[in-house]
């Protein structure tokens, strides 16, 4: 008589549970190469948007570590435009795994946001990561088409995961997700107003270091450079005198004077060669050294202030391993190029980059959807200096009064950053010591900021307030 082990019984029970939930068996990720053992399930695969065009978006879904049946669902989108949410958000910032120091395995991210929520990462639009289209014109994308495709994606993804339709839905992201997330939220609210059936249970949006208003975000870059001693008094003064950013455009020559362009070019030359402008604090990882050590299967990690500054190269190496792509059900079209974080295929509308997002955010907040904007204070690419002003402008336009004045918030009895709240629906917070990718550089503070938002709580302004992530 055959003897059935407890392990076999457990595996059968897991399989039955997966089938019972109605989740897609073919998308179940059994285990990633080099992955530590975990108790939660993960899924990955494609959602077809247009069969005639052959346009499909790739996703990676991770259940909450505990109680996934009752935890909310959080969508995360990276920016760019044109950068991978799977590679960036999932495997570098807030997902459950980080690549190991030599890029051939994974280690646990002890501050993963799946401690608080189910997580969904989507490579959007088509042409980013493993998302694709068989029609080359689809790679001419913009804000409107990106939001439209993501709305279709979510509707069809919920058909794959019907049990999650009723869960609270939070939309989150960073950088150019300052465009992606508000426009998707706006599309969802419009869909809900028209639908007589299913409605998205949207509960809030949170965006880190977001591009919101180009004519304010751009001058903030040079204010940051000057205030951090990264450019000279002469260059800083020249930019202040010569540059009128009120009609600045993304495309060169930016609709500014030649003297202004000369000054900002000089500022860029001074600051970008030896400093990571996305995080001005840590040392750089030099690719030639990192890649050489990867080939030798040695630790390429060069730790600086507790941050693995070479993780970008480790992630690149790991996600290009064929066995990893097979485990993720990725690259089903056998793309003729290596996976990379940001797309070289995408031709994204430069005009859309100029769009002021405040009217869209205003509509969202008027629909009683809470908005939390947060900024890593060591990011010079979309600095908090501009974002703080922009959020204040939005609050003024909404006629919101200050409900919590600007002041420190705490985490683990240390200053986590500074925050201000307007009208009980709009919050701006800095994260102390964090970069453009907040969750990567300050993972514990980022998880705390995220968890409090999900629970509808304010960031604690006293050290003795007991709060759990």
Curated annotation (Swiss-Prot):
Disulfide topology: 83-342, 243-260, 285-310
SUPFAM superfamilies: alpha/beta-Hydrolases
Pfam families reported in the protein's UniProt record: Peptidase_S10
Keyword entries, A-Z: Carboxypeptidase, Disulfide bond, Glycoprotein, Hydrolase, Protease, Secreted, Signal
EC number: 3.4.16.-
PROSITE patterns in alphabetical order: CARBOXYPEPT_SER_SER
Major enzyme class: hydrolase
Tissues expressing the protein: Expressed in flowers.
Active site: 175, 379, 436
Gene3D superfamilies tied to this protein: 3.40.50.11320, 6.10.250.940, alpha/beta hydrolase (3.40.50.1820)
GO biological process terms, semicolon-separated: proteolysis
GO cellular component, one term: extracellular region
Residues of the signal peptide: 1-20
Main location group: secreted
One of the record's GO molecular function terms: serine-type carboxypeptidase activity
InterPro entries: AB_hydrolase_fold, Peptidase_S10, Ser_caboxypep_ser_AS
Residues listed as glycosylation sites in the UniProt record: 134, 255, 331, 347, 461
Subcellular localization, as worded in the UniProt entry: Secreted
Stated family: Belongs to the peptidase S10 family.
Function: Probable carboxypeptidase.
Record-given protein name: Serine carboxypeptidase-like 41
């Amino acid at each position: 008589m055959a003897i059935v082990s407890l392990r076999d019984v457990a595996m059968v029970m897991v399989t039955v549970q997966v089938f019972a939930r109605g989740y897609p068996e073919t998308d179940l990720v059994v285990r990633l190469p080099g992955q530590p053992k975990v108790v939660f399930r993960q899924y990955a695969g494609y959602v077809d948007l247009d069969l005639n065009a052959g346009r499909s978006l790739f996703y990676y879904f991770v259940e909450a570590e505990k109680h996934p049946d009752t935890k909310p669902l959080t969508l995360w989108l990276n920016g760019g435009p044109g950068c991978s949410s799977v590679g960036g958000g999932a495997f570098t910032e807030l997902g459950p795994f980080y690549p190991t120091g030599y890029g051939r395995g994974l280690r646990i991210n002890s501050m993963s946001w799946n401690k608080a929520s189910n997580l969904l990462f989507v490579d959007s639009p088509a042409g980013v990561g493993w998302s694709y289209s068989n029609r080359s014109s689809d790679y001419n994308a913009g804000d409107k088409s990106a939001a439209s495709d993501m709305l279709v994606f979510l509707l069809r993804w919920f058909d794959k995961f019907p049990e999650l339709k009723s869960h609270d839905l939070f939309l989150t992201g960073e950088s150019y997700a300052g465009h992606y997330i508000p426009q998707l939220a706006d599309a969802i609210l419009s869909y809900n107003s028209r639908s007589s059936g299913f409605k998205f249970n949207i509960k809030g949006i949170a965006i880190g270091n977001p591009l919101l208003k180009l004519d304010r975000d751009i001058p903030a870059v040079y204010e940051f450079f000057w205030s951090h001693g990264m450019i000279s008094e002469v260059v800083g003064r020249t930019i202040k005198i010569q540059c009128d950013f009120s009609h600045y455009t993304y495309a060169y020559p930016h609709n500014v004077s030649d003297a202004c362009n000369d000054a900002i070019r000089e500022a860029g030359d001074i600051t970008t060669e030896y400093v990571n402008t996305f995080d001005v604090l840590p040392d750089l990882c030099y690719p030639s050294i990192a890649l050489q050590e990867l080939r030798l299967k040695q630790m390429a990690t060069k730790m600086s202030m507790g941050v693995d500054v070479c993780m970008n190269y480790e992630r690149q190496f790991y996600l290009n391993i064929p066995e990893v792509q097979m485990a993720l059900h990725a690259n089903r079209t056998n793309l003729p190029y290596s996976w990379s974080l940001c797309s070289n295929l995408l031709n994204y509308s430069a005009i859309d980059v100029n769009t002021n997002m405040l009217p869209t955010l205003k509509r969202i907040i008027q629909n009683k959807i809470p908005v939390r904007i947060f900024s890593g204070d060591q990011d010079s690419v979309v600095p908090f200096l501009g974002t703080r002003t922009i959020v204040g402008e939005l609050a003024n336009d909404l006629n919101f009064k200050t409900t919590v004045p600007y002041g420190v918030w705490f985490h683990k009895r240390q200053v986590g950053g500074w925050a201000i709240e307007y009208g009980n629906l709009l919050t701006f917070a800095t994260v102390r010591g964090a970069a453009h990718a907040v969750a990567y550089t300050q993972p514990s503070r980022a998880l705390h900021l995220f968890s409090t938002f999900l629970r509808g709580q304010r960031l604690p302004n006293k050290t003795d307030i007991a709060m759990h992530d």
